[in-house]
From Swiss-Prot:
It is found in: Cytoplasm; Nucleus; Cytoplasm, Cytoskeleton; Cell junction, Adherens junction. Its main location: cytoplasm. The lineage of its organism: Eukaryota, Metazoa, Chordata, Craniata, Vertebrata. Keywords: Acetylation, Activator, Cell adhesion, Cell junction, Cell membrane, Cell projection, Cytoplasm, Cytoskeleton, Glycoprotein, Membrane, Neurogenesis, Nucleus, Phosphoprotein, Repeat, S-nitrosylation, Synapse, Transcription, Transcription regulation, Ubl conjugation, Wnt signaling pathway. Residues 772-781 are annotated as: Interaction with SCRIB. CDD domains: CTNNAbd_CTNNB1 (cd21724). GO terms for molecular function: alpha-catenin binding; cadherin binding; nuclear receptor binding; protein phosphatase binding; RNA polymerase II-specific DNA-binding transcription factor binding; transcription coactivator activity. The modification Phosphoserine is found at S23, S29, S33, S37, S45, S191, S246, S552, S675. The modification Phosphothreonine is found at T41, T556. The keyword ATP-binding does not apply. Phosphorylation by GSK3B requires prior phosphorylation of Ser-45 by another kinase. Phosphorylation proceeds then from Thr-41 to Ser-33. Phosphorylated by NEK2. EGF stimulates tyrosine phosphorylation. Phosphorylated on Ser-33 and Ser-37 by HIPK2. This phosphorylation triggers proteasomal degradation. Phosphorylation at Ser-552 by AMPK promotes stabilization of the protein, enhancing TCF/LEF-mediated transcription. Phosphorylation on Ser-191 and Ser-246 by CDK5. Phosphorylation by CDK2 regulates insulin internalization. This is Catenin beta-1. One of its GO terms (biological process) is cellular response to indole-3-methanol. Residues 734-745 have a biased composition (Basic and acidic residues). It comes from Canis lupus familiaris (Dog).
Length: 781
């Protein structure tokens, strides 16, 4: 190791060389600066003399770090030589940085840049000058292009109109080249004569190259609003539509992209394309296989069809639904699938296109993409499926779609859950296979969980409750479904939905579900314990009062509140109480609410379904002696006897059963006369002994068929964009048909309700009569 004395001796020996190096740097320049004025700055130097603050710098450390940065060492002579080279080439380095084009070709200039990631000061200072130089050059070129085009346009316009097709072709090529540069492109679009000549040439030529160049020129012009207007004013749209029939792919591409730009940004373009027959041409192009071309074409169709019924019908007549469904079934390119799903969404609100899409397999094709990573594609498919689903209740092969929809109920996206619930509601209506499939894949549990999570979001709870209502009746798994709602803790939340803030559409659906749940004896006690019976009576009283009030005012039309007829609520609540009354404890609660006078009054209703459910609940209540006596005391014998002659077998049978039970304590003679009357009324076509009927009417509907929801026209609200108020079968059956034969409608009492004891208290918390209807309206959005 060197001693202190050795180091001092070495330092003294190097002192003259160090001073000489510093003097040279001050006279010339530091090897890494390239700037003469560097000597007058206070930038630190290797000697440390240039900055008084660094007099105490450890030079050994500096030398150590310097050595670490290089793989070889330099002698003082070599350093001096390199320093001299840098000083001699300083001007060349500055010129190379700022004006590289002025250097002689092949000239080598030593660089002062040690690290490629860190530019030198000269290089950094040169950047603005380079940018300025390029800007000036571009400006000169732009001006040259503009001047050249301005001078050439009149002559090129004449050449495009020449009779010699060779001349026309050459002119078209030149115009196409000019349109690629911005300055000349602006000059072209500012010449109406030139644009008209381009359009005319494109439309009339038989030469492929000429067509390609002219179409390409219009495509270039269409990237500017001024160009779009020029094309539009020159009659370019009919010509471009004609080009959609070209056998040349490049011409097709130019034509469709130019039309797409026009449709997006040029006012009046949509009508012009429709009038030129563009829709038919575009639908015919859907059999192409270029996915990017198809994406632009389908987007054009969406723009044209949106909000225009005539366009939707033209697409239908041209075979559009089948072609669009084929695309959804065939391709995987996300943008194409998205644009195609947008067209289908627009068409799915058209009553004519809807069945065509369904018949083409649209439900299954759209269902293929519900698990796609693209959320915009999934959402469009769901919206379209929701719109189509009310027309797809008879479709086969829906197993995969149903399973996916049940899974989507667990999504955190509210829009996804809303659509999935609405689709399931429609697809489970009147389709026992779909009902069984949904039950088998855990649909009951998923729907109950959805209702629990939704809270008071009725756009989710209403379709979910309707789906549960469908799943709990009229199929082999119905009893399992009725039990499953209870086992998955659904009864409390279902009963809760009968209360505020629920609106009438949701209340109607919930009443129907409770009626179905009551078909399962195991649900009788839990429903009673949750307070379902008093709330049903409360709703019944309110709805009946509304119908009475309207009748007393001379109204003949059925009253709608939030899209629901109050007669539907009367029928639904009475029907639910009818099934609940099969349980002896429930009968006691129902009778204790002083409902018998109201049920007797309902026997006078002009609506057959209300007559039937009223007679049905009285039939159940009449099993108890006290109730039978109360029914008779309310004067039920007269209306029941009248109803024996009803042409509705359900009404007549229930009426007979009530009369029969009311006669159990009567003298034998009365029983005999009644038996004759019942036999003659009930068995007019097939006379038989009364005692052969056993328990007539005691279990009508026991197979799980809600008496108010017939197989051919269930109480069903379609969840598609047409709104809650539209039914899949075109009618709402709960109160649709009046009794065909004689009925006591003229004597229907309109005086006040019998005293229910707690009627006023029951009125609190009912939905308002004038709330806005909750519905999805028919829209392309």
């Amino acid at each position: 190791m060197a001693t202190q004395a050795d180091l001092m001796e070495l330092d003294m020996a190097m002192e003259p060389d160090r001073k000489a190096a510093v003097s040279h740097w001050q006279q010339q320049s530091y090897l890494d600066s390239g700037i003469h004025s560097g000597a007058t700055t206070t930038a630190p130097s290797l000697s440390g003399k240039g900055n008084p603050e660094e007099e105490d710098v450890d030079t050994t450390q500096v030398l150590y770090e310097w050595e670490q940065g290089f793989s070889q060492s330099f002698t003082q002579e070599q350093v001096a030589d390199i320093d001299g080279q840098y000083a001699m080439t300083r001007a060349q380095r500055v010129r190379a940085a700022m004006f590289p084009e002025t250097l002689d070709e092949g000239m080598q200039i030593p660089s002062t840049q040690f690290d490629a990631a860190h530019p030198t000061n000269v290089q950094r200072l040169a950047e603005p000058s380079q940018m300025l130089k390029h800007a000036v050059v571009n400006l000169i070129n732009y001006q040259d292009d503009a001047e050249l085009a301005t001078r050439a346009i009149p002559e090129l316009t004449k050449l495009l109109n020449d009779e010699d097709q060779v001349v026309v072709n050459k002119a078209a090529v030149m115009v196409h080249q000019l349109s690629k540069k911005e300055a000349s492109r602006h000059a072209i679009m500012r010449s109406p004569q030139m644009v008209s000549a381009i359009v005319r040439t494109m439309q009339n030529t038989n030469d492929v190259e000429t067509a390609r160049c002219t179409a390409g020129t219009l495509h270039n012009l269409s990237h500017h609003r001024e160009g779009l207007l020029a094309i539009f004013k020159s009659g370019g749209i009919p010509a471009l539509v004609k080009m959609l029939g070209s056998p040349v792919d490049s011409v097709l591409f130019y034509a469709i992209t130019t039309l797409h730009n026009l449709l997006l940004h040029q006012e009046g373009a949509k009508m012009a394309v429709r009038l030129a027959g563009g829709l038919q041409k575009m639908v015919a192009l859907l059999n192409k296989t270029n996915v990017k071309f198809l994406a632009i074409t389908t987007d054009c169709l969406q723009i044209l069809a949106y909000g225009n019924q005539e366009s939707k019908l033209i697409i239908l007549a041209s075979g559009g639904p089948q072609a669009l469904v084929n695309i959804m079934r065939t391709y995987t390119y996300e943008k194409l699938l998205w644009t195609t799903s947008r067209v289908l969404k627009v068409l799915s609100v058209c009553s004519s296109n809807k069945p065509a899409i369904v018949e083409a397999g649209g439900m299954q094709a759209l269902g293929l993409h519900l698990t796609d990573p693209s959320q915009r594609l999934v959402q469009n498919c769901l919206w379209t499926l929701r719109n189509l689903s009310d027309a797809a209740t008879k479709q086969e092969g829906m197993e995969g779609l149903l399973g996916t929809l049940v899974q989507l109920l667990g999504s955190d996206d509210i829009n996804v859950v809303t659509c999935a619930a609405g689709i399931l509601s429609n697809l489970t209506c009147n389709n026992y296979k779909n009902k069984m499939m949904v039950c088998q894949v855990g649909g009951i549990e998923a729907l109950v969980r959805t209702v629990l999570r939704a809270g008071d979001r009725e756009d989710i709870t209403e379709p979910a409750i309707c789906a549960l209502r469908h799943l709990t009746s009229r199929h082999q798994e119905a009893e399992m479904a009725q039990n499953a709602v209870r086992l998955h803790y659904g009864l409390p939340v279902v009963v809760k939905l009968l209360h505020p803030p629920s609106h009438w559409p949701l209340i109607k659906a919930t009443v129907g579900l409770i009626r179905n749940l009551a078909l399962c004896p195991a649900n009788h006690a839990p429903l009673r314990e949750q307070g379902a019976i008093p709330r049903l009576v409360q709703l019944l009283v309110r709805a009946h009062q509304d119908t009475q009030r309207r009748t007393s005012m001379g109204g003949t039309q059925q009253q709608f509140v939030e899209g629901v007829r109050m007669e539907e609520i009367v029928e639904g609540c009475t029907g639910a109480l009818h099934i609940l009354a099969r349980d002896v404890h429930n009968r006691i609660v129902i009778r204790g609410l002083n409902t018998i006078p109201l049920f007797v009054q309902l026997l006078y209703s002009p609506i057959e379904n209300i007559q039937r459910v009223a007679a049905g609940v009285l039939c159940e209540l009449a099993q108890d002696k006290e109730a039978a006596e109360a029914i008779e005391a309310e004067g039920a014998t007269a209306p029941l006897t009248e109803l024996l002659h009803s042409r509705n077998e359900g009404v007549a049978t229930y009426a007979a059963a009530v009369l029969f039970r009311m006669s159990e304590d009567k003298p034998q003679d009365y029983k005999k006369r009644l038996s004759v009357e019942l036999t003659s009324s009930l068995f007019r076509t097939e006379p038989m002994a009364w005692n052969e009927t056993a328990d007539l009417g005691l279990d009508i509907g026991a197979q799980g068929e809600p008496l108010g929801y017939r197989q051919d026209d269930p109480s069903y609200r379609s969840f598609h964009s047409g709104g809650y108020g539209q039914d899949a079968l075109g009618m709402d059956p709960m109160m649709e048909h009046e009794m065909g034969g004689h009925h006591p409608g003229a004597d229907y009492p309109v005086d006040g309700l019998p005293d229910l004891g707690h009627a006023q208290d029951l009125m609190d918390g009912l939905p308002p009569g004038d709330s806005n209807q909750l519905a999805w309206f028919d829209t392309d959005l």
